[in-house]
Amino acid sequence: MNDLRFAFRQFVRQPVFTIVAILALALGIGVNTAIFSVTNAVLLRALPYKNPDRIVAIDKVQTAEGIGGLIAGAYFDFREQSTAFQSFAAYGEDEYILTGAGEPERMLCAEVSPSLFSLLGIEPSLGRAFRPEEEKPGRDQVVVVSESFWQQRAGADPNFIGKTITLNDRAYTVVGIMPAQFQFPKKFEIWKPLALDPVKERHGQQFTLIQLIGRLKPGVTTAQAETELNTVWQRSKIEGPDERGTTRIQVRPLHEELVKDVRLAILVLLGAVGFVLLIACANVANLMLARAAARRREFAIRAAVGAGRGRLVRQLLTESVLLSLLGGALGLLFAVWGVDVIVSSIPAEVAGTIYGLGHIAIDRGVLLFTAGASVATGILFGLAPAISSSKLDLKTSLQSTATTSSARSGLRGTFVVLQIALTLVLLVGAGLMTRSFVRLLQVKLGFEPQHVLTVRVELPRSRYSKGPQRTQFFQQLLERLQDTPGVEAAGAISQLPLSGYSMIGRFPIEGESPTTPEEKHVPIPIGVVTPGYFAAMKIPLLQGRVFNAADRDGRPDVGLVNEAFARKYWPNENPIGKKIGAGCEKTLCRSVVGVVGDVRHEGLAQEPQPEVYTPHLQFPLNSMSLILRTDGDSMRFVSAVRLAVRELDKDQPIALVQTLEEHVSASILQPRLITTLLGIFAGLALLLAAVGVYAMMSYTIARRTGEIGIR
C-alpha cells in the first residue's frame, strides 16, 4: 500500500510524464481491447448450442471442375446409413412475400429440417418446434418466428401461437416463438419446414441444393465421421449430376465453417494491434528509463539507508503496473468507442450474415483480457527499466554531476530502434494492403456503375406459377419504367454482377470433344437477362446482336456468350451460329447470336469466367434484379419503380434497393475495412514512435545542457 501511495505522489509530481505515458498505453491497450472484443465474439466464444463441439458442418468438395453443393438425396442417404451421427439437419433459405398485415414485405426465410432445433439443443421460448411429419410436402404449412417478429408484428401477444400469417399467398400457422438471441445459420425472422420428397430427390426427378449439419455421437471424431460419409457417398445410388470420382465429403466443426470467411482478416488485425501495443510498451519503457535516470540520487539514498535491490525493483514495478492499469482504464473507454465505430461501419445486412458480429460487446471476458493485458504490459515495459535502474554505484550516483551509464543509454537506444522497426513493419504492411486495394479499385468491371439503380423483384410462385405470367409481368414493368422521364435504359438480370451466379449448368458445347466422363458436361454459369440489360449496364456488344422481343418462347432458342467463353471454346473461330445446350431439353438446341464483353460476376479479385446468357422470354425465372440507367441521381426513381410494381400487382414488394455503385462498394467491404483499420493502426504506431524518439532526444539534450553550454 505504501508503494501505491508513493507511486501516486510521483505521478502527480510529474504530470507531463504521467499524461504522455497513460495516453500511449491507452491507445495501445484500447485498440487491442477493441479488436479482441471482435475476436472474442466471432472466433473464441463457443456456439450457444448444446455440446457445440459435437456439431459439424458437412459439405461436398470438388476435386475437379464442377458444381458445388450437396443435394437433398445425399442427406437422406446419410441419415439412413450413417452410424457415426446422432442426427442430421438440412437447411436452406428462400424469399417469401408477407401480406395481410399492411404493406407487402419481402422476407428471407430459413427452410430447415424439423430435426434442426433438437440437434442444436434449442427449444422455442413459446409454443413448440416442428414435428417430423411436417417435413413432408403438403404438411409443411407451419412456421416458427423470431422474438423480434413476434413483438413487432403481434405486440408480444401470447395468443399469437396458433394464428396464421400469409406467405406467398399461402396461410402458415405460427407454432412457436424462438428465444431472442437465437440465430441460425444467420439472422432470420421466420423458419419453416424444408419439405422434401425422398423419392424424387433420390431418383433424379428434382435436385434440391441444401446445406447440412450433423451431431456426432460421443467419442466419434470428425475424421472418422468424414471417412464414413465418404464411403456412403461413393456407394450412393442417387441419380443426378454429381460425379463421385471428382468429389468428396468434408466434415469440419460448425464454428469453423461459420467463421471461415472472416477468420484470416480478424487474425491479421489482431497481429497488427499487437504490434501497436509493443510499440507503446517500448515507448513507455523509454520514458521510464529516462525518469529513473533522473531519480538516481533518490535510489542511491534509499539504498544507502538499507533498501535492497529487490525493494527498488518492486517499487518501480508497482509504478509501471499502476501506470498501465490507468492506461488500461482509459483504453477501455477508447475500446467502447472503437467497437461502435467498427460495428457501425458494417451494413446491417452484412453483419447479420456473419456469426457473432451482432453480439460484439465489452463483456466479462473482454474486461478480464483488458485487466490481464494491462498487468502484463506494466510488467513488460517496467521490468527492464526496474532492473537497470536498481544497479547502483552509490558513490557515483550520489554525486550531483553523475552521468548516465552507457548501458542505460544503450537500452534506451534499443527501445527506440525497436519502436521504429515495428512501426516500419506495420507501415509496410498497411502500404502493401493499400496498394492491393487500389489495384482492386482499378480493375475493369466490364460495365459502368454510375447513375444506375438496382431493385430486386421476387414473384411468388403461388401467383406466378407459369412462365408466360412471369415474362408478361417483367415485360410490362420494364416498358413502364423505360417510358419514365429521366430513365435512359431499363433491363433485368437473374443475378447482379459481383454477387456470384444464380445458375450453373452442365451442357454440351459445339466443337468440344470430352476426353473423360467427367468432362462430358462442362459446368458453365448461366445468366438470364431481358433485351435491355446490356444497354442499361453499358456492356459492349463485340459480335452479332443482343436479344430482342422476338426471342421468345416458341421461337428458335438463342443465347449470348461472353468474350472469355468464345476465346476458350472457339478460338480463332466465328462464334456466331455455334450451338450450345444451355437450358435445353435437346442436345445443342441453342444458337449463339452474339458475343458480349466480360463482366466480373464472382468479385473484383476473380477473373471473368466463361458464361452464357439466355433471354428471359425463353427462360422465365420468377426472381430478377431490375437495372435502370438514369440521367442523374438514380435514387430519385425508387418511388417510380414502387408505383409501377404496385400498378401491376398491389401485393408485390420490392427489395434490395440500392445504386449499382453501392453494390460495387459493398462487394469489397472486407478489404476496404481491413485496409482502413491497418492504416489507422499504422498511423497510431507512427505517432507513438515519433513521441518516443522526441522523448529520447529531449531527455538526451536535457542531460547534456551543461556540455552544450560549455561548447
Predicted regions mapped to residue ranges:
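Membrane-helix entry/capping segments
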Residues: 1-20, 48-49, 61, 95, ...
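Short coil/turn motifs that cap or connect alpha-helices
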Residues: 123, 295, 308, 393, ...
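Membrane-proximal juxtamembrane linkers immediately C-terminal to transmembrane helices
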Residues: 35-60, 82-84, 123, 184-187, ...
